[in-house]
Amino acid sequence: MELFQAKDHYILQSGDNALWCSRKDGSMAVRPATDLLLAWNPVCLGLVEGIIGKMQLHVDLPLGLILIRQKALVGQLPGDHKVYKITKIVVIPLSEDEPQDLELELCKKHHFGINKPERITQSPDETKFLMKTLSQIKSNVGAPIKKKVKENKEKERLERRLLDELYKIFMDSDSFYYSLTYDLTNTVQRQGELGKSDQPLWKRVDDRFFWNKHMIKDLVDLQAPQVDFWVIPIIQGFVQVEELVVNYNESSDEERSSPETPLQEPTCVDDIHPRFTVALISRRSRHRAGMRYKRRGVDTDGHVANYVETEQLIHVHSHTLSFVQTRGSVPVFWSQAGYRYNPRPRIEKGERETMPYFASHFEKEVETYKKLVIINLVDQNGREKIIGDAYLKQVLLYNNPNLTYVSFDFHEHCRGMKFENVQTLTDAIYDIITDMRWAWVDQAGVICQQEGIFRVNCMDCLDRTNVVQAAIARVIMEQQLKKLGVMPPEQPLPLKCYRIYQVMWANNGDTISRQYAGTAALKGDFTRTGERKLAGVMKDGVNSANRYYLNRFRDAYRQAVIDLMMGHPVTEDLYSIFSKEKEHEEKEKESQRGAQEQVSLLLQTYMQLLLPDDEKFHGGWALIDCDPSLIDATHKDVDVLLLLSNSAYYVAYYDEEADKVNQYQRLSLEGLEKIEIGPEPTLFGKPKYCCMRLHYKNGETSGYFHTLRSVTRNPEDDGKDTLQCIAEMLRITKQAMGLDVQVVEKKLERRHSKPHEDIMGIQGKAVDQVLGSGLAQGKSFFLNKFSTLNQKVKQTKTNVNIGNFKPLGKLGTFSKPEVKVNFLKPNLHMNLWKSDSSLETHDSNTGSGALKDHGPHSEEISSDSDSYNSDEQPCSGSRENVDYVLPSCGIVASAPRLGSRSQSIGSVEIAVPSVIRVTGCDEKTMDSLSVAADQSPGAASEAEEAILIDFGTPIDVYCHQFVQDAKTKPIEVFEEVAPAPKPQGPQVPLAPDAKLGSSHSQNQLPRPSQLEVESNVHGANLLTVQPVGSATSCGSQKSLEGITGPSSADSNGSRVVSPFAKIRSSMVQVASLTQAGLTQGINFAVAKVQKSPEPDAVNETQENELRAMFTQCQTRIIQI
């Protein structure tokens, strides 16, 4: 269609249809094409593909007419319906000002032989004269004009920023699609239910996905029959169409694995091998649309953020089969302040206040899809747990039999990029997948319908969700193809088809992610193991200040544009963002200083842990190991700490997922052969970084080296200066030993090092050597948690944001405790900052696991072959001014003083339980479950000395832990939460199918796959805590020795347990002991650290209510 510019109107004309849009007030009118003769001096500007609508970017700016400037054919859906992607748009201001260069394709009819369109514009001489006149006027009234010019500049700047974001939304993310003949907003099943209709396409669309509804509103309101030609429904989402051939003999190397590859006609039609068309259509809801950290959870209309309906179409001959899934944010009121890496989620409203809006959301879903299977992929421990718990609680309160709730901790099952473990989920719910079926239509009509949908979510509803949806859709597709006879019954999908299918879903995930989380420029930072994230200071040099800028400023503009597109008021003052941007520079400097301090603290900690007493510390650096031998399909640069002593250097490898150093290598300086510095080895392109290669000998064998590069904050800095300084220090240190090392600057060769043989794992010591010490070892605790260091940073550096420094900066993140015993080396020296405040405890009944004062130079933990050596200061005999190490609950109960960070004490008394035992509760020891009601907090140490864990069945622990979690209110201190009160007798009944036998005779407790609880069973055994006196009264019990070792299933990360309890090998380990509140003493210790009040009494009414919810719930609750 042609675009004309007249004096008062812009005119779109296609055949006999013409649309007039006023340049004064933006009003629209549909007129005959012959009325073009009535326009004043119309000039053809070029060709356009259609109209999206009009919108006003700001009250100070004119309306803009948004037109489709360029489109691209995506493919053809069944019925030869062509689908197009909008690749370029043009925005024309509806004002009397002349439009700038629109770069439209020229109309051959009106621009024959003309390269550029003519314009209604003034001559150059007239323009010069007017400019001269204006300059004279400005000089005469300079003072008033200056202020107005400044305002105009700000207005122009704001217009440029908003216009730039509008162009990026449409052009950078491949997000908007349309079809002139097919309803992209409705699924095949909904179209079949609507039946054939003579109504125009835009009147049959699903209102949720009609993205330009508000922008085209003025045109629709004309209510003229001629309007139907101009209204084009547009969806935001993703569409890809591919034709696949089921050929088991064909090589997969020639597959077309990229959507950018142009469509090609098959050169040879082979009738032997069946063909089918697969299409993927994702539709994003226009309700609660926006960016990730601007739009979370549910709103007051029951709409959720990032709601996307994804339909997979299979077309064979005349048969079309459809399978639909949805994704959407957790429908509770929650938010994340996206101004730092991995911000902590926060619940905005209470559960009672949330209930009506949660119900409103699912009522609409049930009305549309009949039945829903919720698959919740959020982490069931750590930061995300608060969201998962709130979700489950709302499901119980809603109590709808049309819902099924499935909980699957994706990160635990698929740790280490083991995506094949998603099959654990699909196998567990295979019957549900089969019962859900799919929609099936042919030329005669509807054959069958899909009964329900899967509603999948993680925190962002991005990558985890996409992986799981692709896995479920693949199961359905194979069932469909086998049903149609396209695939043999016992054969999997051919490799070539599967690869193309994988790429389609990967493209879908990338596109949805760019729409919700950012632009395509950040695609390199997108990982398939979890939600989208920046690699942080230690990865690609992208510091937290850039992350802050990205979310704070860019997202503010983009969110404003999206709100304007949807017709929502802009809540943020866009002019105020200009002044906030100036603050960004100060924030950036402050963030850099904070990151440097955190690196220094981390190096100091590992210097104390790794270096023995007879070595002197000479320097430490945070570097990146970029050894080419590590590069593969899943390659990531590995963060390392390089520590230098007077006789050796240490390379400590930091595990990003475990948030700790899990391996290290000690290399003698005598074996350091040479140091090479030069550009990194690359296959293509110019090297981006400078690297340092440290060659060393292993015994008498050469060929070993580490390739390291520095962390650069400036993109123009290759880090060479830092590496040269490190090399010089290594050379000087070796010269002090009477030896020398050669430093060479050259281009590094792309070759592999021999496998390093001296790497020491932190889990290197046998489990049987810890023989019931009662704790997960203080050494492992200090290595994993850095709790004392965190307390010191918290007290002395309040302006340091620990969460920003990723991955090495996660000092404040308490990860889920594992049933592992980690050892660094036999003799470990630890320095703890001395507390100014003490924990009031009783000195009596100190267990055998407590530290004893053996003199001024050593302390020893009994029942442990490993010893702890302190500095040369004697231990005080009292329990004042000490740090209590409680690894059993993953905390340090300490109150570091605000003095100098360098002040430390050499010896520490650690009040630890002597024994942690597991029993089956078959003995009647319920009378010793709790401490006397009048016991003061100071008397809590009796329960710390020996802890006896009693439980009945997995169902008991599952329900009991949920009761405890429901009463626990999180506190924003390093991921710790306020402890729950101690259990008060039997509170949760047994499952009807639970076995009541003694756990001594059980080899393995079954893991509950479905929560079905009845209230008529009495005498249930619970997770209980016994005081010291009862610890020795039980029958033969196993010590910690039997439960601390990781099982074979743990080693590959493929086995995951309940979100509230770990059920493994005759024991149940509560996933978060800080929340279990095992003893009042631990409660008091946690409260002391967090400066929180002591826990209140048990709310029996709330507990009974929660128990009734479990027993009466009509929703299936499944834990995988």
Swiss-Prot record:
Inositol 4-phosphatase which mainly acts on phosphatidylinositol 4-phosphate. May be functionally linked to OCRL, which converts phosphatidylinositol 4,5-bisphosphate to phosphatidylinositol, for a sequential dephosphorylation of phosphatidylinositol 4,5-bisphosphate at the 5 and 4 position of inositol, thus playing an important role in the endocytic recycling. This is Phosphatidylinositide phosphatase SAC2. The lineage of its organism: Eukaryota, Metazoa, Chordata, Craniata, Vertebrata. The gene is inpp5f. It holds the Pfam family hSac2. It is found in: Membrane, Clathrin-coated pit; Early endosome; Recycling endosome. Residues 851-860 have a biased composition (Basic and acidic residues). It comes from the Eukaryota. It comes from Danio rerio (Zebrafish). Residues 167-518 form the SAC domain. GO terms for cellular component: clathrin-coated endocytic vesicle; clathrin-coated pit; early endosome; recycling endosome. InterPro entries: hSac2, Inositol_phosphatase, SAC_dom. It catalyses: a myo-inositol phosphate + H2O = myo-inositol + phosphate.
